[in-house]
């Protein structure tokens, strides 16, 4: 499973990139809105200068024709831009049109397997099932990863699964075990993955022994 960082903060992206494991970035309007004094397109240019893997940039429009035009403009920013499209009927139309133009797409806000299958059939490069938000309403978001992976394997679909709305390290482990191709997560979760109390204890013991 590959690691994406879910942020529009350029300092966090640089920090994640320095770890040597970063394969891409996902952004959304809420994350971009937190970034003051920079335009959306300028921030995307900054991000694509740092990260050479996929950078998902979400459209704001909700009508198919407007999403298509917005997606084409976003794709001009850099060759590694992936246009992020919400899972709606108009979104599917936009995905098909952009795919036919050779533009990569990431269908977001996936909450059931039927939505993922529709997105894949429309030509989506990626689908993003949301784990944490399903957990919030009493569902098991990880079961959705398993369902989507099984359906895609049965039908030979190449669309990749991005496990999104990851809240903690256990989400990462389980998403990887269930076959997600990518996990996108906040920087704090990436850092949490590096930690274990026995690792810290072992380092302390090694240093204590060395300094005897």
From Swiss-Prot:
Q: Report the EC number(s), separated by commas if there are several.
A: 2.2.1.2
- Entry PTM: Phosphorylated during sporulation.
Phosphoserine PTM sites in chain numbering: 39
What metabolic or biological pathway is this protein involved in? Answer: Carbohydrate degradation; pentose phosphate pathway; D-glyceraldehyde 3-phosphate and beta-D-fructose 6-phosphate from D-ribose 5-phosphate and D-xylulose 5-phosphate (non-oxidative stage): step 2/3
Q: Which reaction does it catalyse?
A: D-sedoheptulose 7-phosphate + D-glyceraldehyde 3-phosphate = D-erythrose 4-phosphate + beta-D-fructose 6-phosphate
Q: Gene3D superfamilies from the entry?
A: Aldolase class I (3.20.20.70)
Using the UniProt record, give the first listed, main subcellular location: cytoplasm
Localization in the cell: Cytoplasm
Q: Which GO terms describe its cellular component?
A: cytoplasm
InterPro entries xref list: Aldolase_TIM, TAL/FSA, Transaldolase_3B, Transaldolase_3B/F6P_aldolase, Transaldolase_AS, TSA/FSA_arc/bac
- Signal peptide limits: none
Enzyme class, broadest EC rank: transferase
Question: Could you tell me the superkingdom of the organism this chain comes from?
Answer: Bacteria
Record GO biological process: carbohydrate metabolic process; pentose-phosphate shunt
What GO MF annotations does this protein's record show? aldehyde-lyase activity; identical protein binding; transaldolase activity
The record places the active site at 84 (schiff-base intermediate with substrate)
Pfam entry (one): TAL_FSA
**Keywords, A to Z?**
Cytoplasm, Pentose shunt, Phosphoprotein, Schiff base, Transferase
Report the sequence similarity comment from the record: Belongs to the transaldolase family. Type 3B subfamily.
Q: What does this protein do?
A: Transaldolase is important for the balance of metabolites in the pentose-phosphate pathway. Does not show fructose-6-P aldolase activity.
What protein does this entry describe? Transaldolase
**What is the native source organism of this protein?**
Bacillus subtilis (strain 168)
> Lineage of this protein's species?
Bacteria, Bacillati, Bacillota, Bacilli, Bacillales
């Amino acid at each position: 499973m590959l690691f994406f960082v879910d942020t529009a903060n350029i300092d966090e992206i640089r920090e994640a990139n320095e770890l040597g494991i970063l394969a891409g970035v996902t952004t959304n309007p809420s994350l971009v809105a937190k970034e003051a004094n920079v335009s959306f397109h300028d921030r995307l240019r900054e991000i694509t200068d740092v990260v050479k893997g996929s950078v998902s940039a979400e459209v704001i429009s909700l009508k198919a024709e407007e999403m298509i035009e917005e997606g084409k403009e976003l794709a001009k920013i850099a060759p590694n831009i992936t246009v992020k499209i919400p899972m709606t009927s108009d979104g599917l139309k936009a995905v098909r049109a952009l795919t036919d133009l050779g533009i990569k797409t990431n269908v977001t806000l996936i909450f059931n397997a039927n939505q993922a299958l529709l997105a894949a059939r429309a030509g989506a490069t990626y689908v993003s099932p949301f784990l944490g938000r399903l957990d919030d309403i009493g569902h098991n978001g990880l079961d959705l990863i398993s369902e989507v992976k099984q359906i895609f394997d049965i039908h030979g679909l190449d669309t990749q699964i991005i496990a999104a709305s990851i809240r903690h390290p256990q989400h990462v482990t389980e998403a990887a075990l269930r076959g997600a191709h990518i996990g996108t997560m906040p920087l704090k979760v990436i850092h949490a993955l590096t930690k274990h109390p026995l690792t810290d204890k072992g380092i302390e013991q090694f240093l204590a022994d060395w300094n005897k």
